[in-house]
Amino acid sequence: MISQVERDLSIQNRLPGSDHTTPSPPTSPHLCRSRSKSSSVSGQQQSRNVAHRLSWIILSVLLRRQGILLFAPIIYISCMLFHLHAASFDASPIIHRRPAPGSVYRSPQVYARLRGEIEADNTTADAISTIWKRSYKGVEWKPCVNMSTGVLPVSNGFIFIEANGGLNQQRTSICNAVAVAGYLNATLVIPNFHYHSIWKDPSKFGDIYDEEYFIDTLANDVRVVDTVPEYLMERFDYNLTNVYNFRVKAWAPTSYYRDSVLPKLLEEKVIRISPFANRLSFDAPRAVQRFRCLANNVALRFSKPILTQGETLVNKMKGLSANNAGKYVSVHLRFEEDMVAFSCCVFDGGDQEKQDMIAARERGWKGKFTKPGRVIRPGANRLNGKCPLTPLEVGLMLRGMGFNKSTYIFLAAGPIYSANRTMAPLLEMFPNLQTKEMLASEEDLAPFKNFSSRMAAIDYTVCLHSEVFVTTQGGNFPHFLMGHRRYLFGGHSKTIQPDKRKLAVLFDNPKLGWKSFKRQMLSMRSHSDSKGFELKRSSDSIYIFPCPDCMCRKNKTTASAT
């Protein structure tokens, strides 16, 4: 019969983790005699078995859970992504970036802070009396466009163009058409003015310019007629749309007209070019530039009604500013609703302004600003100098440049956006400000009132004869004026061109002081003075820079004609 000790040992030897896979033999009788030795060996064996058992349990758990280990990386990455996604939503509302200096319209706050100092500035000398005294530096230019006296050769045919855009874009087309006709020895038909839904002006050439004077002035250089001869129109069923039309690329070189247009002109005897805005390169031979000079500076004269009304307003402005020897400042202000809307800039009109601009953009450009992916950045526009100056900013700038409260200013502008509110600060700084509507009666302006180009022509005339011209936004109007003024005033444009990027930063400076601002404005004025004399480079517009193609040095005893 097996003893109890043997049974216990037999059970113990069958547990997982024992040293043997088979049962151990019975204990030696010798070992059984010594209880102490037997107990010691048994304790060591039990301790080892417990450790082995625990190790096996841990290993078996890990082996059974190896499927989880395979998915551990995926689970880890998913948790990290979820955490980052949640963190981004939680963090975005509490990130407050300070707008870049110059990106926010704060000019009203600047004016409120400087207003007292502006009023207290007791400067007696008006800048208008001294502004251009150091301009010429011994270099002066004079008009130098010779007109032909010989007989023109037989014409190669008739060219008919359509001039599109506003007053001065049409003027560009007219001058370029004269140049092309002269270059190709063609006869120019009086250009047709294309009606545009934005300008809404049905005026014809003769309504704006003196047509007879135009034809007579060019008679020995370029033939100009008012219509295509009947014998040619008969071929096209008296319909100009049946005439072969060239769709010329913008800024086409003269070689294109020689190689492509002239052969067709010789074949058809009449051609049409539509549209014709900016269809001739500014980098043209000297002979072609002469035609441009002749057309722009000599042949194009406003029609008698416009010229008379314009000269009347010039005389009124000179009379009002008699204390300054008849000198006045003209400002071309572009703060009409369509300009404000197109600029996509934000001013101080709040929700009402926002709604007005949305409506104006939709009326004028029908979805252009709401296309998918179109991003409007008002702050970036302001930093880049693309926001039109407000009446308030123009006033601050001119006062900083040294023009005092008594200066007479002529404002050339369309209907100013929110005029009652936006014009108040400018009128406060310059109470002698005038517009054509203030200088002329409703009856005097009635023939021009519903025609934007005719009204612009009156503004152009008054600005042309001012002592100082201030441009606040780019465009054809100031560009033509600057060139025309250079032609009249010895090569100097007598024009202030603000650095709008610099102004944006200054008007956004909460610590700006009046003396510091004045220094900055006087520096800007001086820079405009130095840029008054500029010679045309190859790619420049001859309508902005008439020297040296249309002018020659006055201090030379003999000057070669262009």
Swiss-Prot record:
<comment type="similarity">
    <text>Belongs to the glycosyltransferase GT106 family.</text>
</comment>
<dbReference type="GO" id="GO:0016020">
    <property type="term" value="C:membrane"/>
</dbReference>
<keyword id="KW-0808">Transferase</keyword>
<dbReference type="InterPro" id="IPR019378">
    <property type="entry name" value="GDP-Fuc_O-FucTrfase"/>
</dbReference>
<protein>
    <recommendedName>
        <fullName>O-fucosyltransferase 4</fullName>
        <ecNumber>2.4.1.-</ecNumber>
    </recommendedName>
</protein>
<feature type="transmembrane region" description="Helical; Signal-anchor for type II membrane protein">
    <location>
        <begin position="67"/>
        <end position="87"/>
    </location>
</feature>
<feature type="glycosylation site" description="N-linked (GlcNAc...) asparagine">
    <location>
        <position position="146"/>
    </location>
</feature>
<keyword id="KW-0294">Fucose metabolism</keyword>
<dbReference type="Pfam" id="PF10250">
    <property type="entry name" value="O-FucT"/>
</dbReference>
<feature type="glycosylation site" description="N-linked (GlcNAc...) asparagine">
    <location>
        <position position="185"/>
    </location>
</feature>
<feature type="glycosylation site" description="N-linked (GlcNAc...) asparagine">
    <location>
        <position position="450"/>
    </location>
</feature>
<feature type="glycosylation site" description="N-linked (GlcNAc...) asparagine">
    <location>
        <position position="122"/>
    </location>
</feature>
<comment type="pathway">
    <text>Glycan metabolism.</text>
</comment>
<dbReference type="InterPro" id="IPR024709">
    <property type="entry name" value="FucosylTrfase_pln"/>
</dbReference>
<dbReference type="GO" id="GO:0016757">
    <property type="term" value="F:glycosyltransferase activity"/>
</dbReference>
<keyword id="KW-0325">Glycoprotein</keyword>
<feature type="glycosylation site" description="N-linked (GlcNAc...) asparagine">
    <location>
        <position position="555"/>
    </location>
</feature>
<keyword id="KW-0472">Membrane</keyword>
<keyword id="KW-0812">Transmembrane</keyword>
<feature type="region of interest" description="Disordered">
    <location>
        <begin position="10"/>
        <end position="46"/>
    </location>
</feature>
<feature type="compositionally biased region" description="Low complexity">
    <location>
        <begin position="37"/>
        <end position="46"/>
    </location>
</feature>
<dbReference type="GO" id="GO:0006004">
    <property type="term" value="P:fucose metabolic process"/>
</dbReference>
<keyword id="KW-0735">Signal-anchor</keyword>
<keyword id="KW-1133">Transmembrane helix</keyword>
<keyword id="KW-0119">Carbohydrate metabolism</keyword>
<feature type="glycosylation site" description="N-linked (GlcNAc...) asparagine">
    <location>
        <position position="420"/>
    </location>
</feature>
<feature type="glycosylation site" description="N-linked (GlcNAc...) asparagine">
    <location>
        <position position="239"/>
    </location>
</feature>
<feature type="binding site">
    <location>
        <begin position="332"/>
        <end position="334"/>
    </location>
    <ligand>
        <name>substrate</name>
    </ligand>
</feature>
<keyword id="KW-0328">Glycosyltransferase</keyword>
<feature type="glycosylation site" description="N-linked (GlcNAc...) asparagine">
    <location>
        <position position="404"/>
    </location>
</feature>
